[in-house]
Amino acid sequence: MKSRVISMLFCCLFFVGYELKGQKDSLTANSFEPSLNAYGGVLIKAYPDVPHSNHALLLGASLTWQTYGADNWHQLYRFPKIGVELIFADFGNPQFLGQAIGFIPTLEIKGSAKKHWRFKAGFGAARYNKPYDVVSNPKNFYIGGHFTNMSIFSLFWQKPLSEKFLLNYGVSVFHSSNGHTTLPNAGMNIVTAGIGISSRKHNTFHYSKANQVISAKRGYMLKFGLGFHEFGATTKAVGGPGYPSYHLSVWMNKPFRRSGVLQAGFVMAYYTSFYDYIISQQLYDSQEHMRSTTGVVFAGHEFVFGKFSFSAQAGLYLYNPFYIKQKKKEGTWHQLGNKLEAFNTNRIGLNYYPFKKRNSLNQLKGNLQMGIYLKANVAQADLFEYCVGYVF
């Protein structure tokens, strides 16, 4: 899992570094506006016998830069702040939950010109010092290994304190998971209230009229993916082998406004873990390879930031025979959660278009795409996926 967490972190940092590289035009150059934040809240209990948490306290140093219009997409997202937040987290149980250090690339967007609320989202990595251990820490089902993803979603308000400083206050949710690549993987979900202080400058935002004349065209994506996971439930089959899976996706891209793309398509996947289970348990007498595949139709939205984008897709299984057969064999098919997971699947991902023109907004047709995705069935992580595709 360490290599996959590092690859996701590298992609996020690549986005930050690319967008923050020096601009020759001083009028639109990004300005450094750091902040310090404190978050206090509760760790949502995942299972009845997990280690008890008295509280959750997280301290953050946010190294952010305010954009002023060096790229055309900046004004479409109300001139966001881009940067990284360094996190120290304590979970109120030093013996079994310990502490974590996180490094989260973030994107911060203001609500509107006349409002003082802001939204912040970030995807990064964290190292935990007390993960699951079969001998010394057998009940920490939250975190299965030292390295995981760490994400933050914040809604907060700002109040001026002076010409140079702002007071931040609001609510945040932190999530950590390894994408089912190492079990157990219940994941940590922490709900917090936060307060902080940030610096500010008073430069002028630059608006470009070029956004008004760009007309994006519809395209069709063909994408290949390589996934990885451990086979089993969230807390069962600990220590098993990792399995690859192979994914073929086809979908239509329809530009939406000037910063988004609507998606509708189909994904077919082959799971080597399914095939191994079918053979070892003699689950079927024939068509073992066919029954190790799944078929999904989905709809999604892609938020485009220059050469980068964030995708969210919601899908419906049309073909998922192995999962249903396995749950019936285990005697758990009657559970509502299992029935929902047999029909719903979702993906989120970060994408990079290496040859896309920097200020072409949501014109994706004729471009190569590389991406990393997390896939879940309902809310239970399923796998981590590397992708490469082309928009025709």
Specify the residue positions occupied by each region the protein language model found.
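Outer-membrane beta-barrel "beta-signal"
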Residues: A61, N189-S208, I348-L350, A381-F392
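Membrane-embedded beta-strand positions of outer-membrane beta-barrel proteins
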Residues: P34-A38, I82-V84, F119-F123, F153-L155, ...
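Gram-negative (and chloroplast) outer-membrane scaffold detector with strong preference
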Residues: R78-N129, K254-I324, K329, Y352, ...
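Transmembrane beta-strands of outer-membrane beta-barrel pores
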Residues: A38-I44, W65-T67, L86-G92, F123-N129, ...
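Solvent-exposed loop/turn segments connecting transmembrane beta-strands
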Residues: P48-H55, L76, D90-A100, A113, ...
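Outer-membrane beta-barrel translocator domains and adjoining extracellular loop/strand segments
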Residues: A46-P51, Q95-G98, P131-N137, G179-A186, ...
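Residues that define the transmembrane beta-barrel architecture of outer-membrane proteins
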Residues: N30, S53-L59, R78, L97-F103, ...
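Short loop/turn motifs that connect adjacent beta-strands in outer-membrane beta-barrel proteins
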Residues: Q23-S31, G69-F79, G111-W117, P160-F165, ...
